[in-house]
Each structure stands twice: as structure tokens, then as C-alpha cells.
Amino acid sequence: MATDIDLEGVAKAYGRWAPVYDLVFGKVFDHGRQSTIAIADGIGGRILDVGVGTGLSLSEYAPTTRLCGVDISEPMLRKAQSRVRTLGLKNVETLAVMDAKNLAFADCSFDAVVAQYVITAVPDPEATLDDFVRVLKPGGELILVNHIGAESGPRRAFELAFAPLARRLGWRPEFPWARLVGWAARHGGVALTERRPMPPMGHFSLIRYRKNRKL
């Protein structure tokens, strides 16, 4: 698949952001992060956090929720590892540098996969989503928080103006809802259970899919 995003470029971009990521983005993404954690904790069991970054969310999960975290950026992951050691987070099983499209986990390994602000920052979103579903147990949930492009109105104008900066940050600014609809239809093994806007301005959405119990 042709792509406008380069994986190495994304890793470098987030490596540059690592020292200040929590300060710059922590509050902006807080609502989506808290909503996602609440859902994942409600599911419980073993959770995969893709794009775990600096590990900002790790200490906010319930201590009974078992966590595995992966990220493409080594500098970001080093901060996450330091956070786990400092806070003594015993429920974090592993943190590893990993390509989200080629997860080094067996099929049906997790009760939920969490991916916040990830699918617009990977070269092949559909193949990446396929691998998320692969590692889910039957009946497991895929929980996404991501930018979904507006089709019209003031938010559309804002997104177009913001697009050059978004690309420099390693994000794909144009990502319509139709891409997720098309992916789910082609995959055939997931069902949409929720979609709701997140602050600020509804620019991000929380999206949930459930993996079919029988494929």
C-alpha cells in the first residue's frame, strides 16, 4: 500500500518529542486517556497498550489490570521504563520496542487492545488494525482514541490549516471515518460498539470494536 507516512520518520519525530511530551500533550489528551483507561479496567484481564509512549497512562490503570506496552520510539519507551521502575508498577508485564503492524504476540493473547493517537501515525492503518484484532481474544475489545477528519464546517477548515504542522509531528491529518467503516467491512470479524467525540472540540473520537467470538 502506498503511504504518506514513513515508519522511521515517525520514530524519529517521537524521539524528538520524548523529553517534553508529557508537558506538551499530557493535559490535551487527558480526557481521552481517562475514558480509555476506565473502559479497559472495566474489561480487566490482560491489556495491550499500543503506542504506550512515555507510559503516562500506566500508573492510572487499576493494579489488577495486567499491562503490556509497545512503542516504536526507543526514547519514549525509556521514559516509560523509568516510570515503571520509579513507581513500582508490578502489573506491567513488559514494555518493548515494536512495530504496531507486526506485533510479536501470539494470536488471541489479550482481553483488550488500547491504541491512543496511533492509527493516523502509522504507514498502513488497515493492516495495523488487522494485527490488533489478531492478538485479541474472541469477544475482546479494540479501544481507539484518534483524530477522525471532519467532512465540513469550521473544524474542517481548522484541520486543513493545521495539516502541515500535523505532518511534521508524524500524524496523518486526513483520516475520514469512511476508512474505518471500509476496514471493518473488509475484515468481517469485528463489530462497532461505540463512537463518541472527545474534547477538545470533538477533534478526537473514542471508538470501540468487539472481536467476534466465532470467526
Segments and roles (model prediction):
Residues 46, 66, 139-141:
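Short glycine-centered segments of the SAM/dcSAM-binding site in methyltransferase folds
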Residues 112-124:
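A short SAM/SAH-binding and catalytic strip from SAM-dependent methyltransferases
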Residues 27-44:
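Conserved alpha-helix/loop element of class I SAM-dependent methyltransferases that forms part
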Residues 101-112:
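A short acidic, Gly/Pro-enriched loop at the edge of an enzyme's catalytic core
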Residues 126-138:
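A short glycine-rich, Lys/Arg-flanked "PGG" loop and its adjoining helix->strand segment in the class I
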Residues 48, 53-102:
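Class I SAM-dependent methyltransferase SAM/SAH-binding core
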Residues 1-16:
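N-terminal, positively charged/glycine-rich alpha-helical extensions of SAM-dependent methyltransferases
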Residues 25, 145-200, 205:
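C-terminal alpha-helical "lid/dimerization" subdomain adjacent to the S-adenosyl-L-methionine
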